[in-house]
């Protein structure tokens, strides 16, 4: 592998490290601050958080392994995704369902489902990106792009919470900022 390619893979790992930090800062006031009691949270919240954190850690690790020439280890960690990704999809579905059920108690079913529209879209988009990444696992360029896509989806929830929690940004404005940033990185 050329030095230029190696640097690119390492840069991708560092970008996902930044995503990890941003996401954890975003969830600090809504989740991590409640440590160790986590009184308002159910086991599902913890499982979902663990799976999402694991996925981002895999996104950090995988390009670094390629960048350092550890291809066999990259394949082993990638094999773990066959367990992690389906569990992550199930946790996304269950978290979305739980949020919908809470929303129905506070508003109409129509409003509750509208509030979950982004989560539903992300569930299907993540599933599609992951499926395509695995279908193209022998084509490094395509595989990498689809896997990166799974990570870009995490900008929205993390940055929305970060902007709302730390800067008191209106939800709609935070959504626009997160979306523009995601699209900008993707392009």
Region roles according to the model:
Residues 1-187:
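Alpha-helical membrane insertion/targeting regions
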């Amino acid at each position: 592998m050329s030095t230029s390619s190696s640097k690119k893979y390492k840069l991708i790992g560092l970008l996902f490290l930044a995503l990890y930090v941003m996401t954890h800062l975003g969830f600090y006031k809504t989740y991590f601050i409640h440590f160790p009691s986590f009184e308002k949270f159910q086991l599902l919240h913890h499982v979902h958080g663990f799976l999402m954190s694991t996925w981002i850690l895999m996104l950090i690790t995988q390009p670094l392994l390629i960048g350092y020439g550890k291809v066999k280890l990259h394949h082993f960690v990638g094999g773990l995704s066959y367990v992690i990704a389906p569990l992550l999809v199930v946790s996304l579905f269950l978290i979305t369902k739980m949020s919908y059920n809470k929303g129905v108690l506070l508003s109409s079913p129509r409003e509750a489902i509208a509030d979950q529209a982004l989560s539903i879209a992300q569930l299907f988009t993540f599933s599609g990106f992951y499926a395509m990444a695995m279908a193209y696992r022998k084509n490094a360029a395509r595989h990498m792009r689809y896997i990166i896509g799974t990570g870009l989806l995490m900008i929205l929830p993390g940055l929305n919470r970060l902007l709302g929690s730390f800067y008191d940004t209106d939800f709609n404005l935070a959504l626009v900022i997160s979306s523009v940033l995601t699209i900008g990185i993707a392009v």
